[in-house]
């Protein structure tokens, strides 16, 4: 069997407090939702500030395969999306959960057969929840995970379906995003443990409403754990995409762990992005956090304190928080994140193993991690083809000599050029502000 060798990136250590302004590209979660809605809309839409990364480019190519025209206008972050008749084809999902969970409902509306596949690692990710739901709504689908086939009939009946979305909020969002195009719309009822990452469902609902779609939720007087999308027209909407706040967390963490100061411009005052929770997390760990107009600035303390926190709704921040906790001066307890075992990798096991391999003291619990301060040393940090694992290693590397990150290029999934952006942040002398831009 041939052995694949992955390159190692020497994570730079901060020799002084980081002082920088870091401009981040658009949100992956918003970009891919906006692309789906634009593809199903009643006319052309323009998306400004869209993220161009592996995940979003996979979504763009998948929609083009299905018959949607997507063109760049000037900068490659401005996209003109023109709907067209949906057709069959072959879709590469890569490792993008949004592609493998948001596209099958669109494929069910196509006139033709759509074959889905992705990276080898993606074939282990659970998809039976959304595929079984689509079958219950009238779709013809072979398979329960990648690879699978959707035989589109040009329309989908829709109706009511009960699912267990405790593994991922994307199962709910995936059904809701296309539901206005179903003959009967859709009613999605969740039966199971609490749905994780609820802000992502809130994001989906808000964007649907901005597109003129009628949505009933538990928060607006609907049935508990139930979301209803009425059939109707998806209005074409031009959108300006917010910066990706989850990607910003690693750069803000750089200020926190070095006692420095990092500013991220264009931070929204109101947002459904889970990444916004980093403000309260860093504050609780001793950092100074200020939102001044559209600029968010974090100033790091002399020493971070530990934290006891339920991350259930913002689980994607766990790698950043775990890295912070590994460098804090007291124990931390990260709870409510058992669902992370089904992400790009088992993030709980991966974080525990990588921190412990550097001399750390991390224990897996039933639904999270307990992290006790310990002297860390250099070593190889595996990324597991997981972009957030790679950035977590970079955070640790700011304070620990000799951290070598395996396959840092996996960050291109949501933030291509991460290494250059990270290096630019660290490039000038302490006390001299520098600006890193995507």
From Swiss-Prot:
Lineage of origin: Bacteria, Bacillati, Actinomycetota, Actinomycetes, Mycobacteriales
The protein's Enzyme Commission number: 2.5.1.19
Annotated InterPro entries: Enolpyruvate_Tfrase_dom, Enolpyruvate_Tfrase_sf, EPSP_synthase, EPSP_synthase_CS, RNA3'P_cycl/enolpyr_Trfase_a/b
Function summary: Catalyzes the transfer of the enolpyruvyl moiety of phosphoenolpyruvate (PEP) to the 5-hydroxyl of shikimate-3-phosphate (S3P) to produce enolpyruvyl shikimate-3-phosphate and inorganic phosphate.
Catalysed reactions, semicolon-separated: 3-phosphoshikimate + phosphoenolpyruvate = 5-O-(1-carboxyvinyl)-3-phosphoshikimate + phosphate
A Pfam cross-reference name: EPSP_synthase
Protein source organism: Rhodococcus jostii (strain RHA1)
Keywords: Amino-acid biosynthesis, Aromatic amino acid biosynthesis, Cytoplasm, Transferase
Protein name: 3-phosphoshikimate 1-carboxyvinyltransferase
Residues at the catalytic site: 316 (proton acceptor)
Binding annotation for phosphoenolpyruvate: 28, 97, 125, 170, 347, 388, 413
């Amino acid at each position: 069997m041939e052995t694949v060798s992955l390159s190692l990136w020497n994570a730079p250590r901060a020799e002084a407090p980081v002082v920088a302004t870091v401009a981040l590209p658009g949100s992956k979660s918003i970009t891919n939702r906006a692309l789906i809605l634009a593809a199903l809309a009643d006319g052309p839409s323009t998306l400004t500030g869209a993220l161009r990364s592996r995940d979003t480019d996979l979504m763009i190519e998948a929609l083009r395969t299905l018959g949607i025209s997507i063109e760049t206008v000037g900068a490659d972050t401005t996209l003109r999306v023109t709907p067209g008749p949906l057709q069959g084809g072959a879709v590469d999902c890569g490792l993008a959960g949004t592609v493998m969970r948001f596209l099958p409902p669109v494929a069910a509306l196509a006139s033709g057969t759509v074959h889905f596949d992705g990276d080898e690692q993606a074939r282990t990710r659970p998809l039976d929840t959304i595929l079984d739901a689509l079958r219950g709504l009238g779709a013809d689908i072979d398979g329960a995970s990648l690879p699978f086939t959707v035989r589109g009939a040009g329309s989908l009946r829709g109706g009511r379906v009960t699912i267990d979305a405790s593994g991922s909020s994307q199962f709910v969002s995936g059904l809701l995003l296309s539901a206005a195009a179903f003959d009967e719309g859709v009613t999605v009822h969740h039966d199971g443990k609490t749905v994780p990452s609820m802000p992502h469902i809130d994001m989906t609902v808000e964007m649907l409403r901005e597109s003129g779609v009628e949505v009933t939720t538990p928060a607006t007087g609907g049935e508990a754990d139930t979301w209803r999308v009425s059939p109707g027209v998806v209005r074409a909407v031009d959108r300006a995409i917010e910066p990706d706040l989850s990607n910003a967390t690693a750069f803000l963490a750089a200020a926190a762990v070095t006692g420095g100061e990092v500013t991220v411009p264009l931070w929204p005052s109101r947002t459904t992005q889970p990444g916004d929770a980093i403000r309260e997390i860093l504050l609780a760990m001793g950092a100074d956090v200020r939102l001044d107009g559209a600029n968010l600035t974090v100033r790091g303390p002399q020493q971070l304190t530990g934290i006891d926190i339920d991350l259930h709704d913002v689980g994607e921040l766990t790698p950043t928080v775990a890295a912070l906790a590994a460098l804090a001066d007291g124990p931390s307890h990260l709870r409510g994140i058992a669902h992370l075992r089904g992400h790009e990798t088992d993030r709980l096991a991966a974080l525990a193993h990588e921190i412990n391999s550097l001399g750390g003291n991390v224990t897996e619990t039933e639904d999270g991690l307990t992290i006790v301060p310990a002297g860390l040393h250099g070593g190889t940090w595996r990324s597991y083809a997981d972009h957030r694992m790679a950035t977590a290693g970079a955070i640790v590397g700011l304070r620990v000599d000799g951290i070598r990150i395996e396959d840092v290029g996996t960050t291109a999934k949501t933030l291509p050029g991460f290494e250059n952006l990270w290096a630019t942040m660290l490039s000038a002398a302490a006390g001299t502000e520098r600006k890193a831009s995507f």
